[in-house]
Amino acid sequence: MKQLQVLLVAGTHGNEINGIWLFDEWKKSSFLINTHGIKTFKVIGNPEAKKAGKRYIHHDLNRSFKEESFIKINPLNCERTRASELVNLYGEAGENPCQIALDFHTTTASMGSCIVVYGRRDADLALASLIQNQLGLPVYLHESDQKQTGFLVESWPCGLVVEIGPIGQGLLNSRIISQTKLILETLMEQIHEVKNLNLFFPNKLIIHRHIKSIDFPRDEEGNIDGYVHSLRQSKDWQELKKNDELFCKLNGEIIRFEEDEPYIPVFINEAAYVEKNIAMSFTKRELWNFKKEWKQALIDLIHQK
Amino acid sequence: MKQLQVLLVAGTHGNEINGIWLFDEWKKSSFLINTHGIKTFKVIGNPEAKKAGKRYIHHDLNRSFKEESFIKINPLNCERTRASELVNLYGEAGENPCQIALDFHTTTASMGSCIVVYGRRDADLALASLIQNQLGLPVYLHESDQKQTGFLVESWPCGLVVEIGPIGQGLLNSRIISQTKLILETLMEQIHEVKNLNLFFPNKLIIHRHIKSIDFPRDEEGNIDGYVHSLRQSKDWQELKKNDELFCKLNGEIIRFEEDEPYIPVFINEAAYVEKNIAMSFTKRELWNFKKEWKQALIDLIHQK
């Protein structure tokens, strides 16, 4: 059996710096974080953007991991180049092949901590289940979004995003750092347990399945002319029912939620999503039965069968 | 007597947009905001930066109002040019001379609402006293800071900054908009009362006098290697006593407040101040007797004697 290697990424967005702090702390005092002897590689996702104090230089790095991007290095696109580089260094067929990628993010939305999975890969769902079972975190299943693709973790056989908020861009915050550390350690501990076949998977997984994102209200010229209603602001994960308030418009009109079935909003008023025309995303909360295939996929991956 | 004219500025920093929203709302429905018949000019301070979604293009506009800047237009400095333009348009000797400037800002720090005065000008202190008497807001006296000069309101005979937080950069927030509106209306109402000589000034003014700003801890290479301690985060306006925790360093060390006299911190972890090497500012809370000269200066100004 080859040695299991795990890629840890922080600063995929250059202005989300709390995970980077944790890596620096860890470098200084290796005892601070317990990885249970599993080999890890800690990298800053987008060091150029970090230096510039920006989310990205040319394109969002976490939308740059598309198959076609890896064909050639493009000197005019810092992020496509970095995506290729990371895959060449730590991808499954790279210099230091990693089987699992964990990508640490922050949000300006009042989401607390959550795990994001991209699509329904068995090993991802198994690992997310283990974390939900340990920490009770919501799991956000991001799928069916044609406008947003090419996420970093998708380039690894198994990968999760950890998303923590609220925190302003470019700021360090003691609470966010502690929460990041807790989730990182829990992830490593759970991977270790699977490695030792000391398994305890839950029967159910609560999934917040992405349905769609909605834009802010806009005027005829395309300018935003409505803000998130006070009853919706900071109410991530709280169920929306028909006629609930969504936005206040410039003309005083209130825009309400008009769907018949309840949705759960997330990423409400996330600063980085204004440019993506996203005021919030809607999810459906679903209770899924844990599947044996998920468990087997994660075991096979970690044991590199 | 010439007509009193008041300059209202929002978006002096292009990513502080809640005041701009209020102006747009007001344009649409003029009854929404009561200015008591006083002539106002509403301007976006830095429209270029607003378009770019940034605090500024070349330099902070609210540090660009220096006498020497007004000598000539500099096409390579968008903000110096804009500062001259605003003074030419609305300055005391401008096309539409305004006697009072009110400048609406937001902060990512948990400051709530406050009034900022730059230096100890009589009319500013009188107007700030009226607002404190109505709304109980803290008044932050910014002075003795050689590194920060050239503030917009200093170019008008009387001028206050309204600062409201916490809110992420570039975001609209219903609470911030409501608070901005309340303070704007209260300011106009109080100016109106002075105009009508219907005066009620308090006997005392509580001032938070700026003492100094402190930087984040840094390593030998100048990189930030400490974050605001969890006991200090979001504790703006709360008194610091000797040995209180200020920062956590990368090496685990806690940096404490070591002065003998108590200070009151403000702008704790303000995102825009990281580039200014400011982790927070220290003030002293002082109770000042209201002075007759302040009142007279404001009356004279508003009545244009």
Curated annotation (Swiss-Prot), chains A, B:
UniProt EC number? 3.5.1.15
Q: Which UniProt keywords apply?
A: Hydrolase, Metal-binding, Zinc
Any Gene Ontology CC annotation = cytosol
Q: Which residues participate in substrate binding?
A: 55, 62-63, 163, 273
Q: What catalytic activity is recorded?
A: an N-acyl-L-aspartate + H2O = a carboxylate + L-aspartate
Q: Which cofactor does it need?
A: Zn(2+)
Transmembrane ranges, per UniProt, are none
Annotated residues for binding of Zn(2+): 13, 16, 105
What is the top EC class of this enzyme, as a single word?
hydrolase
Show the GO MF annotations: aspartoacylase activity; hydrolase activity, acting on ester bonds; zinc ion binding
Q: Give the cofactor binding note.
A: Binds 1 zinc ion per subunit.
Similarity-based family? Belongs to the AspA/AstE family. Aspartoacylase subfamily.
**Cited PANTHER family:** ASPARTOACYLASE, SUCCINYLGLUTAMATE DESUCCINYLASE
Q: Which NCBIfam families match?
A: PRK02259.1
Designated name of the protein:
Probable aspartoacylase
